[in-house]
Swiss-Prot record:
This protein's name: HTH-type transcriptional regulator QacR
MF terms (GO), sorted A to Z: DNA binding; DNA-binding transcription factor activity
TM segment ranges: none
Superkingdom field: Bacteria
DNA-binding region: 24-43
Keywords associated with the record: DNA-binding, Plasmid, Repressor, Transcription, Transcription regulation
Function, as annotated: Transcriptional repressor of qacA. Binds to IR1, an unusually long 28 bp operator, which is located downstream from the qacA promoter and overlaps its transcription start site. QacR is induced from its IR1 site by binding to one of many structurally dissimilar cationic lipophilic compounds, which are also substrates of QacA.
GO biological process: negative regulation of DNA-templated transcription
PROSITE patterns in the record: HTH_TETR_1, HTH_TETR_2
Classification via InterPro entries: DNA-bd_HTH_TetR-type_CS, Homeodomain-like_sf, HTH-type_Tx_Regulator, HTH_TetR, Tet_transcr_reg_TetR-rel_C_sf, Tscrpt_reg_QacR_C
Residue ranges occupied by any HTH tetR-type domain in the UniProt entry: 1-61
Organism per entry: Staphylococcus aureus (strain Mu50 / ATCC 700699)
Subunit structure of this chain's protein: Homodimer. Binds cooperatively to DNA as a pair of dimers.
Gene name of the record: qacR
Length: 188
């Protein structure tokens, strides 16, 4: 494992354990057996380090989705599977508290805002593809695919976030009910 990967691994665990604000660069340096010079050489700022971790997690998520979606024959099936996968893999859940702290404190700056929007758009884009292909295949007729994609992404994120303490089987049942109601509203 190279030094950059070690720093990323240690930082991720600290962000999960302590949250964003309570994690210090000093702790990251100490536990990664690195130096502040190395940390700043690779990431420039704590914010950039955190964003790099989120990018890595997003890439892992997208790779998993690519492998899973080939099981689906229809876009309806893709919608159900994407939502269930969001729930069962818990998307970013271990980092959720750190993300909320980071989001509320740093989202105001233009560069961070741009990077966070880019991450969010990757998630929304998956819905966009599902809905657009469903339109083309006659599974539904959506006039504003962009808006419907954003609505679906935010609704699913809410279900994932606010049902976390519930039994996984109940959560899956709830997510499938959401998917059914949502898609029934879109059906021709």
């Amino acid at each position: 494992m190279n030094l950059k990967d070690k720093i990323l691994g240690v930082a991720k665990e600290l962000f999960i354990k302590n949250g964003y604000n309570a994690t210090t660069t000093g702790e990251i340096v100490k536990l990664s057996e690195s130096s502040k010079g190395n940390l700043y050489y690779h990431f420039k700022t704590k914010e950039n380090l955190f964003l790099e971790i989120l990018n890595i997690e997003e890439s892992k998520w997208q790779e998993q989705w690519k492998k899973e979606q080939i099981k689906c024959k229809t876009n309806r099936e893709k919608f159900y599977l994407y939502n269930e996968l969001s729930l069962t893999t818990e998307y970013y859940y271990p980092l959720q508290n750190a993300i909320i702290e980071f989001y509320t404190e740093y989202y105001k700056t233009n560069s961070i805002n741009e990077k966070m929007n880019k991450l969010e758009n990757k998630y929304i884009d998956a819905y966009h593809v599902i809905f657009k292909e469903g339109n083309l295949n006659g599974e539904w007729c959506i006039n504003d695919v962009n808006a419907v994609s954003k609505i679906a992404a935010n609704a699913v994120n809410g279900i994932v976030t606010f049902t976390h303490e519930q039994n996984i089987n109940e959560r899956i049942k709830l997510m499938n009910k959401f998917s059914q109601i949502f898609l029934n509203g879109l059906s021709k």
